[in-house]
């Protein structure tokens, strides 16, 4: 996989193949693959795509574009499915970093899941939504004193320790508050999952966690046990994101259980009795393209459960509670981004071939993932039908950046024209949450749809919002 860290400079060439690599016949250009698009998406007799009974053309007319459209039933279905697979919602901590607002926090609460936050801002949103603090865990490699104090004051269930400095800091804060805070220690287990370099998080040379191999993790455990105000209840590992192969989780679990065995062997039962949680983090992959084939969630959960059980039995330990932290797997598939087509250019790339650049009214400010990770997406005409032949194209944004590409090397109907609406699938995770105001474009609105109804859950940013931080 090519690494694309920030996009090329102005006037540099962007990477393209001579012709698109994902060849699709023209009669497939309107297909909305069920493994990629929201559960409740259909087309009406005129070819207009609808989600949960809401025409996308109507939503664009009422709320404007770009527009994030969330299939609420899809989101809730995935919450329930993952909770059932992992033995209950208390074992599933939704990763707020994927996408969070107060409405999403309420859905997570209503479906009985727990919540993983990584900043004071995410914690504040959760508390604003009246999310039960005892079902919140706080992560982060550089939590500030203020964030730790806010978490302790709120009464969060767990704080995941990421450094030895944080151990002393949190012990003092908990002592001042007169409580004993439950904590997990985040481990670096040396497993690099088959994922992009920037989203693989458990190899040794990286900013997260404490290394098992170097002894730093065991040293941190000893320091936690030596405190007066921290109670170690589990070990945490996270090996990456968008993972399809369970082998990485198996090796991670083996090393986590190995450390747990060492801890039990070194400390008396009074200290280790409460050490009952193994959190294997998130990273469950989803389909971004029709040919993607991630493992079914129940199959994956059964394999992870068996891994933890077998590893524990092999060293004679009671089976710990298995916890996970899915974000993308819940939020990603049920959301699309709706764009209006603007400028269309045909550019000669050889004596016999050209590429069509289809410009949309959003871009890297609402979806940085293609530029950042070389992400791939499924894009479709959603405002009408078409029987035109396929044309090779790239879907590009309106920003002053040649790397501003949302979908690279795809196919579109040859009659695609300005004013048409296109949808990009599976944009519910790490699109709005990574969005920016680049070129002073306000962030898009977010609309939830369910049973024929649509409601705004995040309004579109306006020029007034863009000017709101100015001091004169």
From Swiss-Prot:
Pfam families: Orn_Arg_deC_N, Orn_DAP_Arg_deC. Pyridoxal 5'-phosphate binds at residues 283, 325-328, 430. Its cofactor is pyridoxal 5'-phosphate. GO terms for biological process: lysine biosynthetic process via diaminopimelate. Keywords: Amino-acid biosynthesis, Decarboxylase, Lyase, Lysine biosynthesis, Pyridoxal phosphate. Its EC number is 4.1.1.20. Coiled coil: none annotated. GO terms for molecular function: diaminopimelate decarboxylase activity; pyridoxal phosphate binding. Residues 1-23 are annotated as: Disordered. Substrate binds at residues 328, 369, 373, 401, 430. It is an enzyme of class 4 (lyase). It catalyses: meso-2,6-diaminopimelate + H(+) = L-lysine + CO2. The active site is at 400 (proton donor). HAMAP family: LysA. Homodimer. Specifically catalyzes the decarboxylation of meso-diaminopimelate (meso-DAP) to L-lysine. Belongs to the Orn/Lys/Arg decarboxylase class-II family. LysA subfamily. This is Diaminopimelate decarboxylase. It comes from Mycobacterium leprae (strain TN).
